[in-house]
Regions:
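Sec-dependent signal peptide cleavage junction
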Residues: 1-3
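A surface/extracellular/periplasmic glyco- and lipid-processing/surface-interacting theme
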Residues: 6-58, 67-323
Length: 323
């Protein structure tokens, strides 16, 4: 007789964060309200935008392709008060909105694709959009925009921080509090690895790559970009306890330009402590939680700490290489 296939996993609700940081699974910082909502800030990531500011302080960093083979970042902070000066802030896309929605996040960006704007409107998501709020919620760095040599295009000179975001939030009447579930099912005894991953190389496209090197001394993966350590402008390195590398079917939307992400399900890998295990991920609709499973349907337990999440083109050769 043929073996019975494993049953389709039935998603179990992720726990409310309560006293824990919803994005890291660690205790919340002193003075942070238990019902504080996370903030998700869109940040440019192409070579002309470097160096960035405020990424090392983010609890979660999400990287996905946009147009032209480049990637963009979404930096998530567990509460608005913890947001340092961050940027350069750029426009959002619907795939990033879909990731942020189940976390009850307040989104921060300057502009959006028409698809992202439609999704924001349909879902009623709270969005601090600099296209409408301008200097109420964002700051233009005049010194950074000086003409070359050494100057930046104006779109890479807009930044924000906790105080500016709070001003934008209050201007729009956004509630800073709400129910927040944890991003993952966190555990001090994470699901054991099945292979080694002390180095990880990611290829999003011919123009966008990322690398990670694990340090046993720190227990963290240090990120690299364009072959060099990825640091904030002040030199702080970007380091993570967890790497979630998710294969995703990526095509083009009907306009032939904007990327279309199938955010419902796929395969991937989870790296922590120098090890890796394969997984299956499921999300469903835009507001549904992201769930991580083993092949037998057991939910993956993730180590508390900061996480980097990448959505990579399914089927791309050498999109992920472990060393």
């Amino acid at each position: 007789p043929q073996p019975e296939p494993d049953p389709e996993p039935v998603p179990q609700p992720l726990p409310e964060a309560g006293p824990l940081n919803a994005l890291t699974g660690l205790p919340k910082a002193e003075g942070v309200a238990q019902d504080a909502r996370p903030v998700a800030v869109m940040v440019a990531n192409n070579d002309r935008a470097l160096p960035q500011r405020g990424l090392a302080a983010a609890d979660v960093l999400v990287e996905m392709l946009t147009e032209g083979g480049i990637t963009r970042l979404m930096a998530l902070y567990a509460d608005m008060g913890s947001v340092p000066q961050v940027g350069p802030v750029r426009s959002t896309r619907d795939q990033f909105v879909q990731f942020a929605l189940p976390l009850n996040s307040i989104l921060a960006h300057i502009g959006s694709s028409v698809y992202a704007r439609n999704l924001l409107d349909v879902t009623g998501a709270d969005s601090i959009d600099g296209l409408y709020l301008g200097r109420t919620a964002y700051w233009f760095d005049e010194a950074r925009s000086n003409p070359k040599p050494g100057g930046y295009l104006k779109e890479y000179c807009w930044f924000t921080d906790a105080a500016l975001l709070a001003a934008g939030r209050d201007h729009l009447g956004i509630d800073p509090a709400g129910t927040v579930h944890t991003l993952f099912r966190f555990s001090d005894t994470p699901t054991p690895a099945t292979g080694a991953a002390t180095t990880v190389t990611l290829s999003f496209s011919g123009a966008a790559e990322a690398g990670f090197a694990y340090s046993a001394d720190t227990g963290l993966y240090a990120k690299s970009i364009f072959g060099a350590p990825h640091t904030d402008e002040d030199g702080t390195p970007l380091q993570y306890t967890n790497l979630l590398l998710l294969n995703c079917n990526i095509t083009l939307k009907p306009d032939g330009q904007v990327t279309e992400f199938d955010m419902t399900e796929g395969t991937g890998w989870y790296c922590t402590a120098g090890g890796v295990l394969p997984l299956i991920w499921q999300k469903g609709g835009p507001k549904d939680d992201l769930h991580l499973y083993l092949e037998d349907g057991t939910e993956v337990l993730v180590a508390p700490g900061k996480s980097y999440v990448a959505y990579l083109p399914a089927g791309r050769e050498n999109a992920v290489v472990f060393g």
